[in-house]
Amino acid sequence: MMTIPIQSISRLLPQTQCRECGYEGCLPYARALSAGEAPVNLCAPGGETVMKDLADLLGKPYLAPAKTQIKAVALIDESACIGCTACIRACPVDAIMGASKLMHTVISDECTGCGLCVTPCPVDCIDMVPVSQPFLPSARRFSTSAEPRFAAAEHAQSRFERHTARKQRDDAERKALLAQREAAVKAKQAAQAQAQIAA
């Protein structure tokens, strides 16, 4: 049996990183498909088109979608937003702007419609609003594809990769700062201990 490259499978997915398939994102789902551990009908945002393409690529029978999903983008009721940043942390493509204790807003052209921002909102001020675009996000700056479906997916993938790199960089900087502070505290304690011994 021929193994299909994971990237070939991932390329067919919409790159929303929505987790509707039960996996942590599009690439983990592609890995599971490649390993024969997942059915081809789990990608709700991809719909029938993606499921048929996956079935064709993997040489599997077409299965009806396990779930369906209406194309929608997040909309924050800015008058109800308390600025908790829970939605910002949840967004896998950095499509939400705001700061702690200030009003947040969705950059609708960048929203993939994943819906991951809705559940963590403590004041229930985020709605998913149906849109007519067949492929999200509507922004396409980070794509070279002429086909709208793949252009949207490439753009979303690029945004996700940038988001992931930023988070890793922020985490590394935070750990380095904590290590510096810890080293400074230990050095101060050692100096105080030496001073007490000398006295």
PLM regions with names:
Residues 1-4:
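A short, flexible low-complexity segment enriched in Lys/Arg and Gly/Pro that occurs
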Residues 6-15, 37-45, 62-83, 88-89, ...:
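Ferredoxin-like iron-sulfur electron-transfer modules
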Residues 19-29:
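N-terminal glycine-rich anion-binding loops that anchor highly charged ligand groups
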Residues 28-37:
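Amphipathic alpha-helical segments that form the core helices of the histone-fold
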Residues 110, 116-199:
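Flanking helices and flexible, charged tails adjoining ferredoxin-like Fe-S electron-transfer domains
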